[in-house]
Amino acid sequence: MGVPGVFNVYNALAAISAVSFFDIPDQAIIDGLRVAHVKGRVEPVKVPGNYSLLIDYAHNALSMENVLTTLRRYRPHRLITLFGAGGNRPKVRRYEMGETSGKLSDLSVITEDNSRFEDVMDIIEDIKTGLHKTDGKYVVVPNRKEAIRYCMLNAEDGDIIVLAGKGHEDYQEIKGVKYHMDERELIADIIKEEHLAD
């Protein structure tokens, strides 16, 4: 399989079970698994430099733990996790995400993620409550694009940077309005703005 993680093995096994009822040749299944990928699930984004940048939909503590535990097995120089938490959702999720990232990441970059009708800084304070249960290092960069820029400009050789929470989503929801925002486009913009491809 072209995607890492035990959770993806389970997904692949479920898919194999489902297609086994349709007389699909084994080789076709094998070939399909080799090229299978899901947008926003441990999705690599090509960047200049000797670090890896991944987009993942991990938007709760369990999914974040699965992704970060899997990526730890690759022994990165540093594992950097950028994430926020959705507004108008249970606060306990924020505490749990902060604690999970604090335990498993070398650096947490806390930012916005669909604040909805809540103040972004209130959400960030809740995330910090969870982080403070750990010895994890963190920085706060409330604007998501600027948080991504921070990660890219401070990346070191061998780092793995995970942009968690948005995944396949191409919007940011603020005060009841969904604004277009695709992390892939933000990354491309940052590469141009910072002349990183030169």
PLM features per residue range, with description:
Residues 1-6:
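A short glycine-threonine-serine/GTX helix/turn-capping micro-motif
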Residues 14-40, 44-198:
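ATP-dependent carboxylate-amine ligase
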